[in-house]
Amino acid sequence: MARYLGPKLKLSRREGTDLFLKSGVRAIESKCKIDTAPGQHGARKPRLSDYGSQLREKQKVRRIYGILERQFRNYYKEANRLKGNTGENLLVLLEGRLDNVVYRMGFAATRAEARQLVSHKAIVVNGRVVNIPSFQVSVNDVVAVREKSKKQARIKASLELAEQREKPTWLEVDAAKMEGVFKRVPERSDLSADINEHLIVELYSK
């Protein structure tokens, strides 16, 4: 399955919430009818079955993190294998992706941009270049912008935008040095309350 390359806001309208695929910190309501699905009959909201609700939630989370179906299923299998709550384990694994950490630290305005920075070798982990977006960042890892990439205007602009976002408490960022530390594994209370991971577990448990 290929990565979706169409209009980003259409996906947010499909899910009925801002997926932060393109909007950064700006209110998405000012740009599109977020409560209306795309298409001629978007204003009509069909009543979803239990399966439909579970599928929509899975699609929403998958799109937030920019992950393909096969990757997402593998994350679920890993989360299920680990001790503890499967749904919470899933979110922790997704939050630990390098592209997500780069976004959370403010080096990129969106996760898609963060993925591009990683792929283009603009990011180092513990002093070594890592160009794999799915790389799992561990506690105490130091994630930084590569020295020769620090002059990129988009990174500087992203750091300015990040000042308007809520700062993750599990990360420690030095914006001046363009580096940060993954201090601890995030707890469920640290993450979005707009995600119902239990629906995803129910979907894959069938």
Curated annotation (Swiss-Prot):
Q: Which PROSITE patterns match?
A: RIBOSOMAL_S4 (PS00632), S4 (PS50889)
A GO BP term, please? ribosomal small subunit biogenesis
Residues covered by the S4 RNA-binding domain: 96-156
What Pfam families does this protein's entry cite?
Ribosomal_S4, S4
- CDD domains documented for this protein: S4
The question of whether Lipid biosynthesis is a record keyword is answered with: no
Which InterPro entries is this protein grouped with? Ribosomal_uS4 (IPR022801), Ribosomal_uS4_bac-type (IPR005709), Ribosomal_uS4_CS (IPR018079), Ribosomal_uS4_N (IPR001912), S4_RNA-bd (IPR002942), S4_RNA-bd_sf (IPR036986)
PANTHER family the record matches: 30S 40S RIBOSOMAL PROTEIN (PTHR11831), SMALL RIBOSOMAL SUBUNIT PROTEIN US4M (PTHR11831:SF4)
Q: Which family is this protein grouped under?
A: Belongs to the universal ribosomal protein uS4 family.
HAMAP family, alphabetically? Ribosomal_uS4_B
Q: What does this protein do?
A: One of the primary rRNA binding proteins, it binds directly to 16S rRNA where it nucleates assembly of the body of the 30S subunit. With S5 and S12 plays an important role in translational accuracy.
The entry describes its oligomerization and partners as: Part of the 30S ribosomal subunit. Contacts protein S5. The interaction surface between S4 and S5 is involved in control of translational fidelity.
Official protein name in the record? Small ribosomal subunit protein uS4
| Record organism | Pasteurella multocida (strain Pm70)
